[in-house]
Amino acid sequence: MTAGLLGAVAPGFDRPLDVLEACHGRITKQCDTLNKLLTHLPINGADAQAQQAARAVLAYFDTAAVHHHDDEERNLFPLLEWVGASGACDLVETLTLEHDELALLWRRLRMELQQIEKGEASTLDETLTGRFISLNRSHLEFENTHVLPLARQVLGTAEIERLGRAMAARRNVPFVY
């Protein structure tokens, strides 16, 4: 575990499933920010707060969320298939398709957020933003209630370490076990 500057404790890559779950919490917080932007913008426009919020959402989904999907698609999902987890193939197919849809939605939403970040626009497409938030929330709920418990059940110590090492390497940080 690593302590943050503000005292928050984040799991280390020696506990990669906890890292993924913590990331789900951060994605949820970014979705909360998007939801707040939907109500903030019509009243306040692209003021400094809106620009800062857009910047934070952009930074998160352009970096950490990309790593997160790579962690799952390149490492976790193949490990679940490799150990022969029940239903893993169907699960992986469904979740990968959802990741693809989220990526498409993000590309469209990203353009709008960039305009808000620059103060050049003061609206978000409510349907697009709502779909992005809704799909993220249902996707994360499913992963938290089905995928992560399955992984905790079927992955052994060696697979967990392999996952953690890959996740740390993706971020260019040392793996400490």
Regions found by a protein language model. Give the residues of each.
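Small-residue-biased structural context
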Residues: M1-Y177
